[in-house]
Amino acid sequence: MATGDKIVTLDGLKAVYDSQDTDSIKQDVADLKSNLEAAVNGHHYGVRWDKASAQMTRTGLAADITTTTTNFKHSGSVNANYNNPFDSIYPWSGRKLCNISLNAYRVLQSGDSITDCVVAWEGDPDFSYEHEDGVWVYTPEFWGTSYDEGGYRYFDVCDKPITGYVHYPAHITARNLGVKETRTIDGASKAIVLPKLGMPCVREAMSTIHTYAKNGGMTLDSIYSLDASILLMLVEFANYNSQSTIGQGTVSLYYENDAGLIQEAATSSTVIKVLASQAQALAIPGAIIDIGTSKGGNQVGTYHVVSASTSGTITSITLNAAVTVTTDHFYSVHGHIIVADESIGSMSGYIGTDGKCDAYYRGESLWGNMWKYVLGAYKNTDEHVYLAATDADADNYDAINTSVHLDTGVALSTTQNYIKTLGFPEQSGRLAAPCFCTEVGGSSSAPVGDYFYTNVSSCPCSDRRW
């Protein structure tokens, strides 16, 4: 018998096993035990936040996954070294782009699968970024939670129902802001919004855009669908500073100035002329140009840049449509039109110049230089956050109703600045990763790395698409 061999006796029979074999058997048994536990208790992937730094520490089954996420995404161009372990971990692996049939969605019945309205998945031959009903993001069912312990905030995602965890049902959300169009629905001409390519629907009241969505049998994003995306993103990228880890969004495509005047009058022309010192860096294809009689206004109209050229001190901007302007008209730049960004697909990151293109989290443009209305969360005049108790309540209202919406007791900061402290409405039982700023005084890098804006009156809680 060789040194290191082990003798196993069973019913009086002896067998000799090499020590390496027995070690392998022990590992197999340990793996089996782990798999059995996961089958009962679920697979848990989490992060721990110290509330001082944006960077987090991984926990649970994610503990051995690197927090260096450079190759989890695309940055500027397609990443040849792309390697994201979460691509093979549920529920992240199941989040993907799809085309839907709006007509099929409108007739879904209670109990039907949300995927019954899907007509093509990303990768299918008939999937299209130019589909008549737009491009959507499917997120599969999962469970999640967050809690304080020992001075840390823990976030956890699980693939099984766990007592006390928030249940996130399978859902489909818009990839981008909606584009407004008119359709005949039930025999009537109605304005609707769909996540298609082109000019996003902006400068409309929340109630108006909500009506457009409901005209098509849809709704707007709620605090609950947003919460699902935030939780998945926090656990995957292990960092609260999403602009640093994933991409800034179109924060640099912004210009409003008293000196932002048209430099030459034109009649029914697709070309406007402006000072190069103001516009040269912003006049990129797809940038949204507002022209108006006041700074930042669009009384004349909203257009986008097709091309631009500079000669001396003047930049000539070719627009997508003809316009009549005088030298008394102002121009401003507000973000970017919706483009396909096919190289990103269902992945994360950005294609283009950081700050001048959309940034995506697993296919969804979550932030950019435009406000996004979120149903179901409101700030009251007492600065408290009020929440809709159910998805139905979130969809039924687009303004605060204190007889329906619940006071969470979370008081928002009354001043604007970088976020220092986040408030978590524990009693809601519906949110695991809410983003309510209760104290400012942080920085552009920590502990969250984002800015908090507030309003003096009761209003919807909005998500800045940054």
State where each predicted segment sits:
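C-terminal, surface-exposed recognition/capping segments
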Residues: 49, 53, 223-224, 231, ...
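Short aromatic-cysteine micro-motif
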Residues: 126, 130-133, 156-300, 308, ...
